[in-house]
Amino acid sequence: MAVFVVLLALVAGVLGNEFSILKSPGSVVFRNGNWPIPGERIPDVAALSMGFSVKEDLSWPGLAVGNLFHRPRATVMVMVKGVNKLALPPGSVISYPLENAVPFSLDSVANSIHSLFSEETPVVLQLAPSEERVYMVGKANSVFEDLSVTLRQLRNRLFQENSVLSSLPLNSLSRNNEVDLLFLSELQVLHDISSLLSRHKHLAKDHSPDLYSLELAGLDEIGKRYGEDSEQFRDASKILVDALQKFADDMYSLYGGNAVVELVTVKSFDTSLIRKTRTILEAKQAKNPASPYNLAYKYNFEYSVVFNMVLWIMIALALAVIITSYNIWNMDPGYDSIIYRMTNQKIRMD
């Protein structure tokens, strides 16, 4: 019995984290089910939902084949640390168990966007306020240049007139506590991103896809400070759920219903699953490679469209030739056909 309880605890610890779909367009189909998704394949799910290829096939039944000719214009990935799952409203959200919760990044997706849409300068924003880590490329440099990213900037932003402090029910949270301010500053970042994007709506209407990756650790710090059973943690969790729902609705609306908003909740990352060793049998790299970055070929945005057009036209022509040949081969012209008719000269001779 004790062994069974231990196994249940281990399973709950491994599969307690969640990967949720807050919003998705009709062209991206996520099936309802309890299929676990490995943590290291989260970037592949984001890439496939945007229409990009991945190195390894993803045999996960949660993501179905959607409309190949209508891909989402934006992917928004929000990762919340410090909690297994949030009390999201049932029915409006699709959630899957997350196994092997290892640290991941969307750098591969960002690189695909840069290589395919380098001339259109799409918006790529990766932000972790608690670590003061920010990565902005393309039009994000000009649009989000006023976004508060450092802790000092976030603190000053909170005490301005149009901050979220004036609209959020703080309840047990305090404005004078650094941990609480860190949590509230992350909510301010969510609000500012949607607010800045609403002033530049033309960015959400271009042909290049956009990527937003946000890492929120404020709830984790509140749990460490007050405890997960504290009133502060419960209030912060409820405030975060409301803020995430509003943020998802705003981003989904700004992109005209053509955006995927995803949420990853992780209690803690399992760093023991990360392999950092190298084998001594690893093949040696060339001393002077032609390209040290191993860059992929730059394909045109219309590559998949043209390929499908040529493919189906060739299939249609091949079927037309086969059907025509079959009909000619089995054609019975009959005795009234011109093939069997006799000329007038032949009739006179007879």
Curated annotation (Swiss-Prot):
Residue intervals passing through the bilayer: 303-323
Tissue expression remark: Expressed in brain, heart, placenta, liver, kidney and pancreas. Barely detectable in lung and skeletal muscles. In the kidney cortex it is restricted to the mesangium of glomeruli. In the coronary and kidney artery it is expressed in the subendothelium, associated to smooth muscles where it colocalizes with REN. Expressed in vascular structures and by syncytiotrophoblast cells in the mature fetal placenta.
Post-translational modification: Phosphorylated.
Residues on Cytoplasmic side: 324-350
Subcellular localization: Endoplasmic reticulum membrane; Lysosome membrane; Cytoplasmic vesicle, Autophagosome membrane; Cell projection, Dendritic spine membrane
Main location: endoplasmic reticulum
Keyword Metal-binding: no
GO MF assignments: signaling receptor activity
GO cellular component, one term: extracellular exosome
This protein's record includes keyword Signal: yes
InterPro entries, sorted: Renin_r_C, Renin_rcpt
Function, as annotated: Multifunctional protein which functions as a renin, prorenin cellular receptor and is involved in the assembly of the lysosomal proton-transporting V-type ATPase (V-ATPase) and the acidification of the endo-lysosomal system. May mediate renin-dependent cellular responses by activating ERK1 and ERK2. By increasing the catalytic efficiency of renin in AGT/angiotensinogen conversion to angiotensin I, may also play a role in the renin-angiotensin system (RAS).
Protein name: Renin receptor
Organism, scientific name: Homo sapiens (Human)
